[in-house]
């Protein structure tokens, strides 16, 4: 049995993304925790090493704030680019934390939000393919579709990580913790 452990503010952790079949999908080597509770994890990273399932590696290009919630089937990456804030939202299982990393299952569907507020649902074909290959249960499909709707409402209502104050507060907290 894996012991669950909530990371503390200022701690650096790994983030591990899996696929439904249990295979590792992607690993972010270091994220600094800005807030850690049973329900919400908020972190920050910048120029972080990412390792793909096939062993390829790359480095993130810009600072980002990451948002995970234990009750929703998505997580959000807020990326700070020269032309504004972009959001990349992964439809995923709720997170779990253990002594090794923060972990979740990536369910292929993504929503990309642009600085002007427009957004697009991505990778529906990949989702359908993996749903068939990995035999996603019908219940998972229903939950994910419902969470796509919730996520779109949050985007349109500027709720949670899409609220302007969220970005201001957590970007400043990250700068302070990292001594930028």
From Swiss-Prot:
GO molecular function, one term: nucleoside diphosphate phosphatase activity
EC numbers, comma separated: 3.6.1.15, 3.6.1.6
Domain of life of the source: Bacteria
Residues that hold Mg(2+) 1 according to the record: 90, 106, 110
Keyword Hydrolase attached: yes
Residues reported to bind Mg(2+) 2: 108, 110, 123, 126
SUPFAM superfamilies, alphabetized: FomD-like
Catalytic activity entry: a ribonucleoside 5'-triphosphate + H2O = a ribonucleoside 5'-diphosphate + phosphate + H(+); a ribonucleoside 5'-diphosphate + H2O = a ribonucleoside 5'-phosphate + phosphate + H(+)
Cofactor(s) it depends on: Mg(2+)
Catalytic residues of the enzyme: 26
Entry-linked Pfam families: DUF402
Signal among keywords: no
Enzyme class: hydrolase
Keyword tags: Hydrolase, Magnesium, Metal-binding
UniProt record similarity statement: Belongs to the Ntdp family.
Function: Has nucleoside phosphatase activity towards nucleoside triphosphates and nucleoside diphosphates.
Protein name: Nucleoside triphosphate/diphosphate phosphatase
Annotated organism of origin: Staphylococcus haemolyticus (strain JCSC1435)
């Amino acid at each position: 049995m894996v012991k669950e452990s909530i990371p503390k503010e200022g701690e650096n952790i790994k983030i591990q993304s899996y696929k439904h079949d249990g295979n590792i999908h992607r690993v972010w080597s270091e994220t600094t925790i800005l807030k850690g509770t049973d329900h919400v994890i908020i972190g920050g990273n910048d120029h972080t090493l990412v390792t793909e399932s096939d062993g390829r590696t790359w480095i993130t290009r810009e600072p980002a704030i990451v948002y995970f919630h234990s009750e929703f089937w998505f997580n959000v990456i807020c990326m700070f680019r020269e032309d504004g804030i972009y959001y990349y939202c992964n439809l995923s299982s709720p997170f779990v934390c253990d002594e090794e990393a923060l972990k979740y299952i990536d369910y292929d569907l993504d929503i990309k939000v642009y600085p002007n507020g427009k957004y697009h649902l991505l990778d529906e074909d990949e989702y359908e393919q993996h749903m068939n290959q990995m035999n996603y249960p019908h219940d998972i499909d229903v939950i994910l579709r419902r969470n796509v709707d919730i996520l779109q409402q949050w985007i349109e209502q500027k709720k949670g990580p899409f609220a302007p104050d969220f970005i201001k507060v957590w970007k400043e907290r990250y700068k302070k913790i990292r001594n930028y």
